[in-house]
C-alpha cells in the first residue's frame, strides 16, 4: 500500500491569526494558529471574525511550519503546535500537510475542533494529530440546531472515531448560565466521559463577553449580550464532578 503524503499538492491555507506562545489551547506552551472559516454560528462564539471562508491571510504549510519552528525552544517537553479556528476541519488537507511537517520535526500536534464533520481529509488530519480538544456544546439535538446551527450527531460520530483510533481527547464545553449550566448537560458530559476511554481530560470554560466589541464592529447582534457570565467557582466544581468519570 502506498503511503499517503498530505504535503503533496497541498493547498495554501487561510489563517485568521497566530498566537506564538499560547498556554490555554493544549498542553504546555504552544504555537497556536487560528484558521479562517467556520460553518457553524454558535451563539457564544467569541471569534465571529473567523466565520468568513474567504478572509484571512494565505499561508503554505511550509511557511506556517517555518513560523512555528521559530518558537520551538519555548515548547519544552509538554508544548507544541495547535490548530484552532474558526473550524480547522474546513481546511483539513492544508492542516494535515502542516501537521505532517510538524510531526516529522518531532513537534506535538493538537487540534481544537467542534467535530462537525468527518470526511477522508479529516480522517487523514486526525491520523497526524496527537491530541484533540473537542468542543461539545449542548446535550441535545434541539439546542444544537438552535444555538449552533449544527448537529450533535455529527460531533458524536466524530468522538466515536476518536475513541476507535485511541486519540487522546480533551472534552471541552462552555458553561453558559441558563443554557449549559444545567443538570442535563452535566449528566450528558459525564456519560460521554465514562463511555469513551479516549477522553482523559475535561475542561469547563466560563462563558465570557469580551467578544461584544467584535460583534459591534461587524454590525451584527451578539445573541447572548444579555446573558450573565457564570460564577467561576461553580464552573470549576462542575468540571471536577465530570472529571470523576474519566476512565
Q: Over which residues does each language-model region extend?
A:
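Conserved AdoMet/S-adenosylmethionine-binding subsite of the radical SAM
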Residues: 69-73, 77-80, 85, 89-210, ...
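Canonical Radical SAM [4Fe-4S] cluster-binding loop centered on the CxxxCxxC motif
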Residues: 11, 17-19, 23-59
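Solvent-exposed alpha-helices and their adjacent loops that cap or buttress functional pockets
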Residues: 8, 24-26, 75, 125
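Conserved alpha-helical substructure of the radical SAM core
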Residues: 48-81
Amino acid at each position: 500500500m502506498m503511503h499517503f503524503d498530505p504535503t503533496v499538492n497541498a493547498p495554501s491555507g487561510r489563517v485568521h491569526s497566530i498566537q506564538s506562545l499560547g498556554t490555554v489551547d493544549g498542553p504546555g506552551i504552544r504555537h497556536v494558529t487560528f484558521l479562517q472559516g467556520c460553518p457553524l454560528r454558535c451563539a457564544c462564539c467569541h471569534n465571529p471574525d473567523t466565520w468568513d471562508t474567504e478572509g484571512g491571510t494565505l499561508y503554505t504549510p511550509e511557511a506556517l511550519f517555518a513560523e512555528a519552528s521559530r518558537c520551538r525552544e519555548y515548547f519544552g517537553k509538554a508544548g507544541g503546535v495547535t490548530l484552532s479556528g474558526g473550524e480547522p476541519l474546513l481546511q483539513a488537507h492544508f492542516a494535515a500537510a502542516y501537521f505532517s511537517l510538524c510531526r516529522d520535526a518531532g513537534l506535538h500536534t493538537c487540534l481544537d475542533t467542534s467535530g462537525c464533520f468527518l470526511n477522508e481529509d479529516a480522517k487523514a488530519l486526525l491520523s497526524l494529530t496527537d491530541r484533540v480538544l473537542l468542543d461539545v456544546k449542548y446535550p441535545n439535538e434541539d439546542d444544537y440546531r438552535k444555538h449552533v446551527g449544527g448537529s450533535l450527531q455529527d460531533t458524536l460520530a466524530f468522538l466515536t472515531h476518536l475513541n476507535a483510533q485511541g486519540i487522546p481527547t480533551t472534552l471541552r464545553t462552555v458553561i453558559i448560565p441558563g443554557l449549559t449550566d444545567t443538570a442535563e448537560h452535566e449528566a450528558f458530559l459525564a456519560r460521554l466521559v465514562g463511555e469513551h476511554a479516549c477522553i482523559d481530560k475535561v475542561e469547563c470554560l466560563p462563558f465570557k463577553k469580551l467578544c461584544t466589541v467584535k460583534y459591534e464592529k461587524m454590525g451584527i447582534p451578539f445573541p447572548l449580550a444579555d446573558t450573565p457570565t457564570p460564577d467561576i467557582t461553580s464552573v470549576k466544581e462542575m468540571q471536577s464532578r465530570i472529571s470523576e468519570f474519566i476512565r
